[in-house]
């Protein structure tokens, strides 16, 4: 189990079932990125979402998920997802609209103000974790020291690398969900970690909610004029 190198998983006689996302949700997040992928830098997930070695960068943001509208927005307020070339050290917004994913960003590294990230691309289905159910990898209590959201029982699913062309690491990344459900019965999405263009990224989700006004932020969304474009984004899958 890949988590064994970091923490001892809580014994679970029967693996938990894969979680289902709520009909809508809002969550704040922090994203930590390190360009290091040498043997001295352990793969995520990291305690408190922070790698044990320098260098690394920490950013903030929020996500709004509304699959009934065919929409999801991820606002990265400090730096973007580390898959863009030559680097992603710029703020960005990635959103799904009308089966297309767009990137809004400043005019940096040939991006901006808006480009098409992917076509035929929609928010993840609410039951997307069912396809990964077999990759349950253990549960932890002690991933958080200063991050309360990580100091609870979390179930982890670690995905194998789908393409040998990306990197020589044995895994692509993983998902962490809190065992304790929300009042609605849905389980909060706590963590997502993955391999970037170089290095690793680890997102930690806080203030996850499936009720309240923030879950309706996309109700009146309209495609920005700057995104009426055929310009494709330059990124590395």
Give residue ranges: language-model regions.
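Alpha-helix initiation/capping motif
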Residues: 15-26, 125, 146, 150, ...
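Short acidic, Pro/Gly- and aromatic-enriched capping/linker segments at domain boundaries
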Residues: 127-152, 156, 204-215
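Short beta-strand segments that buttress and anchor functional surface loops
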Residues: 29-31, 49, 73-79, 152-169, ...
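An acidic-aromatic
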Residues: 53-133, 193-202
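Exposed regions on extracellular, virion, or secretory-pathway luminal proteins
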Residues: 107-111, 121-128, 145-150, 162-169, ...
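Non-transmembrane domains of secretory- and envelope-associated proteins
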Residues: 3-16, 139, 166-171, 178-237
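Short, solvent-exposed coil/turn segments at beta-strand boundaries
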Residues: 22-24, 62-73, 89-101, 150-154, ...
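N-terminal leader/targeting segments and the immediate start of mature chains
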Residues: 1-71, 108-113, 119, 136-149, ...
């Amino acid at each position: 189990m890949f988590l064994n190198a970091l923490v001892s998983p809580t014994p679970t006689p029967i693996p938990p079932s894969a979680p289902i996302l709520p009909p809508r949700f809002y969550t704040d997040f922090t994203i930590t990125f390190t360009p290091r992928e040498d043997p001295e830098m352990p793969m995520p997930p990291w305690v408190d979402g922070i790698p044990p070695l320098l260098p690394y960068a920490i950013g903030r943001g929020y996500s709004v998920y509304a699959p009934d509208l065919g929409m999801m927005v991820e606002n990265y307020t400090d730096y973007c997802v580390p898959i863009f070339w030559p680097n992603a050290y710029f703020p960005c917004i990635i959103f799904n609209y009308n089966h297309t994913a767009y990137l809004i960003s400043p005019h940096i590294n040939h991006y901006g103000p808006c480009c098409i990230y992917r076509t035929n691309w929609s928010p993840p289905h609410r039951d997307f974790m069912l396809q990964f159910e077999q990759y349950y990898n253990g549960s932890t209590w002690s991933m958080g020291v200063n991050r309360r959201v990580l100091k609870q029982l979390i179930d982890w699913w670690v995905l194998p690398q789908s393409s040998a062309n990306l990197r020589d690491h044995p895994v692509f990344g993983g998902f962490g969900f809190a065992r304790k459900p929300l009042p609605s019965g849905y389980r909060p999405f706590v963590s997502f970690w993955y391999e970037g263009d170089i290095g690793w990224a680890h997102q930690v989700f806080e203030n996850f909610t499936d009720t309240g006004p923030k879950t309706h932020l996309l109700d009146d969304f309209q495609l920005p004029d700057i995104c009426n474009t055929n310009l494709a984004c330059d990124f590395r899958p």
